[in-house]
Regions:
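Hydrophobic cores of alpha-helical transmembrane segments in multi-pass integral membrane proteins
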Residues: 54-57
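ATP-dependent carboxylate activation and anion-phosphoryl transfer catalytic cores
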Residues: 1-50
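Acidic, glycine-rich flexible loop/linker segments
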Residues: 11-12, 18, 22-27, 59-105, ...
Length: 178
């Protein structure tokens, strides 16, 4: 199997292959792999009573991710926030153990952004869930999520409007394509 990116000429209608590569981990993974999730009856009842659907998009993978929302408009914002925290730490304004601040991305956090590029990969590898406003099954976010076995929801147009920094969310890719 191959991941093939193509472009269509808007005037002539001609199709062009712009990139082709062997499919990443998805094709190589065992079709018989089963992920098992267990929730207590109390948690299930709580979710049924209070849980609500915040946004939808295209599911990538078959896993469920949960964590604190870390929202970024662009990768430049990631760099600016990281530098601000490093400066405050160096100046003694922040304690090392107080890095729950919304500017710091921690292992298992939920990455929420417009779209990803290769610059995002260090954060993506640490993510418990990736949510992008733009993209589809062949987008950078989807390919990297499959490669690292991280659940992702791409093309989730409402995410940046309804999610808030540090909000605890759960995203399920185990229930189908959307």
């Amino acid at each position: 199997p191959m991941d093939i990116e193509w472009a269509k000429d808007g005037i002539t209608g001609d199709l062009f292959i712009v990139q082709a590569r062997p499919e990443t981990v998805h094709a190589n993974s065992s079709a018989s792999e089963i992920m098992r999730y267990t929730m207590s009856a109390e948690l299930i009842n709580d979710l049924r009573r209070s849980g609500k659907l915040l946004a939808t998009g295209q599911a990538v993978g078959k896993r469920i991710g949960t964590g604190r929302v870390r929202m970024y408009e662009s990768y430049d914002e990631v760099i600016r926030r990281k530098r601000a925290v490093q400066k405050r730490l160096a100046e003694g304004e922040l304690e090392e153990d107080l890095l729950l601040d919304e500017r710091v991305f921690e292992q298992g956090d939920v990455l929420v952004t417009e779209m990803t590029t290769p610059d995002w990969e260090p954060l993506m590898k640490k993510s418990g869930l990736i949510i992008t406003r733009k993209g589809g099954r062949t987008s950078h976010a989807a390919i990297i999520a499959r490669e690292f076995g991280i659940p992702a929801i791409v093309g989730c147009t409402g995410a940046m409007r309804v999610l808030e920094p540090l909000m605890e969310v759960t995203g399920s890719c185990a229930e189908g394509d959307e």
